[in-house]
């Protein structure tokens, strides 16, 4: 009887581990405590356009969605908790089209995040909304900013891949942790 309980427990553990590894909903560990909210290099405006990553050397882009926001993703964008992009050509397109108009408003309940990791191991993060009618970012520094190239960004987000590991650790290794 004791042997059956051990075998059953082991099989249950293996099944749960398999689900955790392959379901597309990893555990996300983030380090917010050392976030520098005052990086003046991010806030330059060119002709009323705000692009906080235009001059950054980006290694990867990570989208972390709240469970509620996953249901609101537009058609074609993979409905998973974490999407990632590390393809250089796609990152370059993204940098060129990640342009926003600052509205001066505030979006109250933005729970999803976009996280940019640079080649210098700096981390840039801000809250993001991606749904059928909107792409926008929300930060303490600039408030709500609406995407100027939403259609192009939708196409880029459709090419992001599902993060397949069970844990995602977002921490600046020897770099800085900043809000966009």
Task: Describe the residue ranges of each PLM region.
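Function-determining sites in protein domains
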Residues: 2-9, 16-180
